[in-house]
Amino acid sequence: NVPETAYAANMSDISVTSTREDVQQVVDDGNFDYTELDGTEIDHIYELYNNDPETIKQLQRQSDYNATGDIATLSARYTHSSMFDGYKVIKGIDVSEWNGDNINWKKVKAAGISYAFIRVGGRYYGSGKYFIDSTYKDNIKNALNAGVDVGVYFYSQAISTSEAKTEAKYTTDLISGYNITYPVVMDYEYAWEDGGLSGRLYNAHLSKSAATHVIKAFCAAVESKGYVGMIYASKTVITDDMNASSIAQSYPIWNAQYNDTDTLTVKHSYWQYSDVGKV
């Protein structure tokens, strides 16, 4: 008998004729690197994953974890901003269909998770059309049944106040009838394409003032429906691309900063310290 030789899929196995299974194998083997893809290959991968605008980001996250095993856990120690000295830290997670359709929410609750932000949908970064997260209804229902408080987020690509208001209405319509007690979040981030930042939001190059008006329009529209509006963005975007201090006067901010120390100095209420984790 000839022994089988272990085979690891790599980036050379990805082309414009690859199947979703081909791409996923490269990810599972920890060898996915979006910087090695050309524009047509990236477009093909987006199509394989139903044009979800978070595809490249999520595949890279999964691959990086599979390659290193570096993952955030509740037991790790993280240093919060000194502005929270004396505060009680409450732990939560954020999920989408990228986390699968069989989350055991009772185990999530038992692991010490008090709340979850659940993706309900978003806007495609190219066409500007909306999409719905296929797992949001079950995630909301099952999280609530397990005693996990729920907030939601919408992947935004709004470039005007009118678009922001429309996104807010779309989001609140989707969650009507559910007991949403945590914020309704505008996920304000740039898309990845051709090895760099892209998409209608990034390409609009909004001024800090214009971006601030867009964000406030979303939050105000959400607030008018009885929810708390909130903005999610990376520390860099919060610092460089919006008037965060002005936003913080009226609405909470969720800081995405992936390290063991929260260094954002502007007032904020939530800190996402990792983009991969388990409970």
Model-predicted segments: where are they?
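Functionally critical loop-and-helix segments that line ligand-binding/catalytic clefts
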Residues: 14-105, 246-279
